[in-house]
Amino acid sequence: MVIPLRNKYGILFLIAVCIMVSGCQQQKEETPFYYGTWDEGRAPGPTDGVKSATVTFTEDEVVETEVMEGRGEVQLPFMAYKVISQSTDGSIEIQYLGPYYPLKSTLKRGENGTLIWEQNGQRKTMTRIESKTGREEKDEKSKS
């Protein structure tokens, strides 16, 4: 079978377009910067008995865990959320889901790899907790 020269160039052109289109497709987004476990940097309080507190952000939940005097590690009820906006400065705004959480929070990168969490008029600067293997915690839930 002989293909005319004009058709060969057409086929080559289509192949080139397909390669360019497939190469320009958006790559899968990397894990958001705020996923993982963060130390709230909370100083032990004289009355509440909380020694330390951590926050874990996953794909759709915020889980706070406190280490309390005499009780050990206590996980507070998780809060489901959704991302509602992202600013040009890289900060994101999340809204909590559920009847008791009509509130919003802002998460943004701080200096030296910290996370700034603004919620209920409070501003917390948190540092990432590294796992025992020395790697950053990436507690993203896997989808089933």
Swiss-Prot record:
InterPro entries: Calycin (IPR012674), DUF3255 (IPR021664)
Range of residues in the leader sequence: 1-23
Skewed-composition ranges (Basic and acidic residues): 127-144
Keyword Transmembrane: no
Name of this chain's protein: Uncharacterized protein YxeF
Highest taxon of source: Bacteria
Keywords: Signal
Region (Disordered): 119-144
Pfam families: DUF3255 (PF11631)
